[in-house]
Curated annotation (Swiss-Prot):
Substrate binds at M35, R77, L115, E156. Its main location: cytoplasm. Its EC number is 4.1.3.40. It is found in: Cytoplasm. Keywords: Cytoplasm, Lyase, Pyruvate, Ubiquinone biosynthesis. Monomer. GO terms for cellular component: cytosol. The lineage of its organism: Bacteria, Pseudomonadati, Pseudomonadota, Gammaproteobacteria, Enterobacterales. Removes the pyruvyl group from chorismate, with concomitant aromatization of the ring, to provide 4-hydroxybenzoate (4HB) for the ubiquinone pathway. This is Chorismate pyruvate-lyase. It comes from Enterobacter sp. (strain 638). It catalyses: chorismate = 4-hydroxybenzoate + pyruvate.
Length: 165
């Protein structure tokens, strides 16, 4: 199963440099903290619509492969993050199987829990980079995060109803 927003997320093209955007837009796109928390600060009830979750082969994560270790399988989670029931963000998380050890095994059991609620409670979270991307009129970003030094990729597409626009 897929969703049109996730098709658009996979079509994002990334900028080599930070594009000329308003300070408000850059504040959203370059946010280092939890997007879930940021949405909640807007006074919204944040929920997850789970689109896909499970192991996939490297063929299904080809755009993330150059930024992750080469492995046989990856844990893929695709979601819509909704604010008061309205989709604000499409999210795609790609986790190499080798990352899924110790506490990071919890990444496989998030279900409808927002990723940010797990990631940003870890004292072992670091972010290697944020890249800003665009497809048509929508903006997005991708980050390589590390939990206890183990990598994962997070790609987010801001949907038209989100406060970015």
């Amino acid at each position: 199963m897929s969703h049109p927003a996730l098709t658009q997320l996979r079509a994002l093209r990334y900028f080599d440099q930070i594009p000329a955007l308003s300070p408000e837009q850059l504040d959203w796109l370059l946010l280092e903290d939890s997007m879930t928390k940021r949405f909640e600060q807007q006074g919204k009830n944040v929920t997850v619509t789970l689109i896909q979750e499970g192991f996939v082969s490297s063929d299904e994560v080809s755009s993330e492969l150059p930024l992750l270790p080469k492995e046989e399988r990856y844990w893929l989670r695709e979601i819509l993050l909704c604010a008061d029931g309205e989709p604000w963000l499409a999210g795609r998380t790609v986790v190499p199987e080798s990352t899924l050890s110790g506490p990071e095994l919890a990444l496989q059991t998030l279900g409808k829990t927002p990723l940010g609620r797990y990631l940003f409670t870890s004292s072992e979270l670091t972010r290697d980079f944020i890249e800003i991307g665009r497809d048509a009129d929508l903006w997005g970003r991708r980050s390589r995060l590390r939990l206890s030094g183990k990598p994962l990729m997070l790609t987010e597409l801001f949907l038209p109803a989100s406060p970015l626009y």
